[in-house]
Amino acid sequence: MMNKSILLMGTLLVSASVEIAAQKNSENPNIVFVLADDMGIGDLGCYGQKKIKTPNIDKLAEKGLLFTNHYSGSTVSAPSRCSLLTGKHTGHAYIRGNKGIKSEEGFFDLHLPSDEVTVAEILKRKGYATMCVGKWGLGGPHTTGSPVKKGFDYFFGYLSQGAAHRYYPEYLYENEDKVMLNKKVYSHFLIMEKGLDFIRKNAGHPFFAYFAITPPHADLDYPDLSQYEDAFPETPYINNKQKGFKTQMKPKAAYASMVSEIDKNVGQIIQLLKEKGILENTIIIFSSDNGVHCVGGHEPDFFDSNGPYRGYKRDLYEGG
């Protein structure tokens, strides 16, 4: 059994759908899909979280639909994203694990073949502008699995899911070209900036904005821990090896900060949609790719991150 993932849909899913059904000439709704990385169902206030503040997502849940029987496609990143974008059960999907392959440009995940159709390709045929920012994980640059060859007009972020463990990367990809950051930029901030800019530029016609953001996946790395710095008893996570996750002296504060950052981002998206006058014609969906992780210093039991369910990421139980 797979993870009960987090899926929230705003009230506008219902209102927009009803209006479109009633009026043949209605404008197609915009679609915003925010996919968190390794977030547990219990990490949000609307699912019972008491220690981490998520007011924007909680409000979205209050006014929308709260899914309690929705399962992710897999217990790890790449196959879950493959199922999400192709609509296929993992048993029929092309990508069924986080297996990677080497190329001249680096180490990337298995790439989707040309005959695999994504939801972005379908929406693009219907006149949608399409975007993916964040983690891709379904193929490297200049392959059939590149996002710009799978229906996305614009991509910015990590093409390799394995590279997305580092929040201060050497580079990110814009479409299929490297953008050098030299390990000096917190990637998530730049990824969100690019995604919001896409909405600004495309507010005049239907769009599909897929925010495949990387928090709260380990590394537990966030530049400002002040919101939760002294809120919890901490057990430092120390890794002196060259491989593995980054040392974090306050892992609980870091994890909570990353979850609250995601909540802030959802608020930013909603505010921008309001400013552009398109909120009432936009479907907003929030989910996680799989269950909560328990690496890099994160203690899921402290936050009750998996809620009432058994297991964590990689486990074949509903918490994973």
Language-model features: locations:
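Bacterial Sec-dependent N-terminal signal peptides
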Residues: 1-26
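Active-site-proximal cap/lid insertion segments
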Residues: 26, 38-52, 68, 72-75, ...
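Amphipathic alpha-helical repeat scaffolds
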Residues: 30-34
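N-terminal carbohydrate-binding accessory modules
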Residues: 23-29, 58, 63
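Catalytic cores of carbohydrate-active enzymes across secretory and cytosolic contexts
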Residues: 134
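Active-site segment of extracytoplasmic enzymes that catalyze sulfate/phosphate-ester chemistry
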Residues: 41-131, 150, 154, 160-165
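Local beta-strand N-terminus motif with an aromatic residue
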Residues: 29, 128, 152, 281-282
